[in-house]
Amino acid sequence: MKVTKAELAHVAVKAEQYPKNQLPELALAGRSNVGKSSFINKMLNRKGLARTSGQPGKTQTLNFYEINERLYFVDVPGYGYAKVSKTERAAWGKMIETYLSEREELKAVLQLVDIRHRPSEDDQLMYNWMKHYGIPVILVATKADKIPKGKWQKQLTAIAKTLDKEASDPLLFFSSATGLGKDEAWRTILNHLKVTE
């Protein structure tokens, strides 16, 4: 998809701060430092729109990125990061759970996992939780440029097996560094939303 307009339109910690224009939303979930901000920047062709950080746990709000006035990417706080207080983690958890389980505009979750590693227990819990709530999932294996191309399929198979992935859930590889997988990711997203470019 050709992105002509992209902006951070809303920052929310509670439902009354969510956008009111009823555009379809795709949430991005993943462990801290899996590359959600880099994914957003590469997909939207906007360097620095989503702030990347070497410090895990940087995103602490629901960040709504409006794209071409047609849809939103919603960056949610990364999970699995221990260096925040239990109180903060509980607050994030409640905020994320409320959004994911109750938001009517949410059409799917892009769950990002690192292609170099088997999904963590947190990844598995998140995937199973979304399946429990009937939320469609598009799995994106990030950092594909970090391993040889010959190992991609083996790693994708391991990811699918570890998560006990449902056959209907797409599993894509992606590299924010090279743009690898970007077109396929957009095709999958638009197909899921049943909209054309």
Curated annotation (Swiss-Prot):
<feature type="binding site">
    <location>
        <begin position="142"/>
        <end position="145"/>
    </location>
    <ligand>
        <name>GTP</name>
    </ligand>
</feature>
<protein>
    <recommendedName>
        <fullName>Probable GTP-binding protein EngB</fullName>
    </recommendedName>
</protein>
<dbReference type="InterPro" id="IPR019987">
    <property type="entry name" value="GTP-bd_ribosome_bio_YsxC"/>
</dbReference>
<keyword id="KW-0547">Nucleotide-binding</keyword>
<feature type="binding site">
    <location>
        <position position="59"/>
    </location>
    <ligand>
        <name>Mg(2+)</name>
    </ligand>
</feature>
<keyword id="KW-0131">Cell cycle</keyword>
<dbReference type="Pfam" id="PF01926">
    <property type="entry name" value="MMR_HSR1"/>
</dbReference>
<feature type="binding site">
    <location>
        <begin position="57"/>
        <end position="61"/>
    </location>
    <ligand>
        <name>GTP</name>
    </ligand>
</feature>
<keyword id="KW-0717">Septation</keyword>
<comment type="function">
    <text>Necessary for normal cell division and for the maintenance of normal septation.</text>
</comment>
<dbReference type="GO" id="GO:0046872">
    <property type="term" value="F:metal ion binding"/>
</dbReference>
<keyword id="KW-0132">Cell division</keyword>
<feature type="binding site">
    <location>
        <position position="37"/>
    </location>
    <ligand>
        <name>Mg(2+)</name>
    </ligand>
</feature>
<feature type="domain" description="EngB-type G">
    <location>
        <begin position="22"/>
        <end position="195"/>
    </location>
</feature>
<feature type="binding site">
    <location>
        <begin position="30"/>
        <end position="37"/>
    </location>
    <ligand>
        <name>GTP</name>
    </ligand>
</feature>
<dbReference type="GO" id="GO:0005525">
    <property type="term" value="F:GTP binding"/>
</dbReference>
<keyword id="KW-0460">Magnesium</keyword>
<dbReference type="InterPro" id="IPR027417">
    <property type="entry name" value="P-loop_NTPase"/>
</dbReference>
<keyword id="KW-0342">GTP-binding</keyword>
<feature type="binding site">
    <location>
        <begin position="75"/>
        <end position="78"/>
    </location>
    <ligand>
        <name>GTP</name>
    </ligand>
</feature>
<dbReference type="GO" id="GO:0000917">
    <property type="term" value="P:division septum assembly"/>
</dbReference>
<dbReference type="InterPro" id="IPR030393">
    <property type="entry name" value="G_ENGB_dom"/>
</dbReference>
<dbReference type="InterPro" id="IPR006073">
    <property type="entry name" value="GTP-bd"/>
</dbReference>
<comment type="similarity">
    <text>Belongs to the TRAFAC class TrmE-Era-EngA-EngB-Septin-like GTPase superfamily. EngB GTPase family.</text>
</comment>
<feature type="binding site">
    <location>
        <begin position="174"/>
        <end position="176"/>
    </location>
    <ligand>
        <name>GTP</name>
    </ligand>
</feature>
<keyword id="KW-0479">Metal-binding</keyword>
<dbReference type="GO" id="GO:0005829">
    <property type="term" value="C:cytosol"/>
</dbReference>
